[in-house]
Amino acid sequence: MDPFPLVAAALFIAATWFITFKRRRNLPPGPFPYPIVGNMLQLGSQPHETFAKLSKKYGPLMSIHLGSLYTVIISSPEMAKEIMHKYGQVFSGRTIAQAVHACDHDKISMGFLPVGAEWRDMRKICKEQMFSHQSMEDSQNLRKQKLQQLLEYAQKCSEEGRGIDIREAAFITTLNLMSATLFSMQATEFDSKVTMEFKEIIEGVASIVGVPNFADYFPILRPFDPQGVKRRADVYFGRLLGLIEGYLNERIEFRKANPNAPKKDDFLETLVDALDAKDYKLKTEHLTHLMLDLFVGGSETSTTEIEWIMWELLASPEKMAKVKAELKSVMGGEKVVDESMMPRLPYLQAVVKESMRLHPPGPLLLPRKAESDQVVNGYLIPKGAQVLINAWAMGRDPSLWKNPDSFEPERFLDQKIDFKGTDYELIPFGSGRRVCPGMPLANRILHTVTATLVHNFDWKLERPEASDAHKGVLFGFAVRRAVPLKIVPIKA
């Protein structure tokens, strides 16, 4: 018997084992994975907290296995800067969840498109047109009208002595503010059936995108859609895209029929202008999917953050008093804050930053993917690896923040730290080329809604015995309170 084939096979196996072992030694450290499931059984209900604990043992550049999905967890500003800035091109890809394939969203959405010509055009239209300083200034009166509506609703509840579900009120107001800015229209009314329909669709999309899906970790299951995620996503995405397409087509037809009519100061007008001028190589479907991203991402994250801000202020009466005093000194007898007042409200800004530090709405940001092998801090991150940035862990790191678990807005009065993507210890909106495009609008919404609620009313819990309910949270697209915050407005 010729021994050569056996020797060759043995050498091949040995070489493969050696290369694999050497490659494994160069990967970031992490807990040992179990067969098939990897480290999934270790995650618990709050993965961001689990990752933070594990990073204390394995370091700020850590690897785990989520089923067959190899994942690297980043837990320090230094490593976040390496990923998002120094090697931003390499880590500009996205891991695409099965739900995002609904209605081909992954092929059209700016949030999930690979960095290329289409992505650059969409990014450019956001930066230069939709969210430019001038565009935001032009549309602020539309938003002020919606803040007045929130004020009137709270006044009515105050007169009747009934509590407000802050999450629901913030959701409706955020949706109205976004609808006014995008379409010059009011999407929802308080206490209406239309409200519940919008709430159902947008929260449906958010919950499906945020729910753990076995098919994302075991690709062999994707064709079977065992949890029905893709089927449900197709329904919710389709309904929301249908509404948005209706608004866009209605505006296009109106412009054709009334070419001399005055233009509106909203984003939709800007987008139709861009389509007409052919300044960007984009189609109508790109814009409808962009609007979907803005509605779902903006309304869900802003709503969640406003609820956390109000909880923290309610739990810290002295902080609430400081915000009220500052607002009174700047606003005087005005009931609705003007966006131009924001630079004169440093304590309000500090409150929002501190809440974002403690409660980043998306604690792990949107997942990134390595487009090629890359060595970071001496460790190999292989092509195709998912990369998660644990913004929550960085916000609670005692080496970065004094008393990290305490709500202390004053820390931001002494530090020139912002959440716009250059200070990596505070990046709730991300950073680099994948930073959230809607951040300028979200920033204004968070400050103006908080100011309107705090300036005009004192607040008390509807059920004081529920004061410890903030301890439970629900992990998903955004990490929200497990028990909705219901508080009673008292006319100040």
Curated annotation (Swiss-Prot):
- In the UniProt record, does the keyword Iron occur? yes
PROSITE patterns recorded for this chain? CYTOCHROME_P450
CDD domains hit by this protein:
CYP76-like
- Swiss-Prot/TrEMBL cofactor(s): heme
- Gene Ontology biological-process annotations: diterpenoid biosynthetic process
Name the predominant localization.
membrane
Q: Which GO terms describe its cellular component?
A: membrane
Q: Where in the cell is it found?
A: Membrane
Q: Where are the transmembrane segments?
A: 1-21
EC annotation from Swiss-Prot or TrEMBL: 1.14.14.175, 1.14.14.-, 1.14.14.60
Q: How does it sit in the membrane?
A: Single-pass membrane protein
Q: Which family does it belong to?
A: Belongs to the cytochrome P450 family.
What is this protein called in UniProt? Ferruginol synthase
Record the organism.
Answer: Salvia fruticosa (Greek sage)
Give the encoding gene's name.
Answer: CYP76AH24
